Amino acid sequence: MQLFAPAKINLSFKILRRREDGFHEIETLMAPISLRDELTIEPNESGFVFSVDDPSLSAGEDNLVVRAARSFFGDVQEEPRVRITLRKKIPHGAGLGGGSSDAASTLLGLNQLYGGRLSSSRLTNVAAGIGSDVPFFLVQSAAWCRGRGEIVEPAAVPSMPILLLKPQFGVSTSWAYQQWRDSRELPGVDFAAQSAGELSLQNDLERPVFEKHIFLAQMKGWLRDQPEVAAALMSGSGSTVFAVLRDSNSADAIAARAREELDPMLWACAAQL
């Protein structure tokens, strides 16, 4: 069985408050994009085997694919007898939800392989126990996510061309949340909501992340200055900044200019909402 795990971007991200359980109450509009990882799941009578083609990622118990598989088999009370192979395209520490998407696709694939043993509501509960973003990826469409992210309401989002830019460094999501309360807006950086068609783009996590990583603020500002760009925003906790393009044919030219003017080592990817 072959499955595809899409990346996501946050089109809107608001932090409402810090909760007593340590999580943050959020409201975010997330949308899957055409960039995606690939998973293969097949029966394996000798037990559970997991491999990933990215040597920088753990293939151990802390990998979200492994956690998802363990959670699924624990819930259905079966011995895990599958081989899962993960081929990565989504960069790590990028704010694109790659690990959460891989976990959700693992749950969906295993549930299909085992005859739909878990109901959709039970699958959602299992997903929420793995990570806050995992329930969103079960929906396989754009959605408003509330609570700590586990309350998911599908939404309609128009298709748009986008360009993703990411520097070599990543950003820790937990660190970004921890810094949010005491962070301040940097002078000269525009944090105001931007319009892109019917959408209003804004991200509350830009404030703490830009304080530490001023380059991301500069990259966002640079993108907004490009005539082919309608809006630009950091996705999630970063370090990816995405641009909504007026024309999909401009992606390569913008990426080339960004590498020339900002950082020759930038990772760039043209994608579609």
Whereabouts are the PLM-identified features?
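Short, well-ordered alpha-helices that flank and scaffold nucleotide-derived cofactor binding pockets
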Residues: 70, 74, 108, 112, ...
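ATP-binding N-lobe of GHMP and related small-molecule kinases
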Residues: 1-94, 111-121, 148, 166
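ATP-dependent small-molecule kinase catalytic core of the GHMP/sugar-kinase superfamily
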Residues: 2-4, 12-28, 116-231, 244-273
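Glycine/serine-rich anion-binding loops at beta->alpha junctions
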Residues: 85-114, 132, 231-245
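Short, basic/glycine-rich phosphate-binding loops at helix/coil junctions
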Residues: 45-58, 106, 128, 194-202
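Short strand-connecting beta-turns/loops that link adjacent beta-strands
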Residues: 44-46, 157, 228, 237
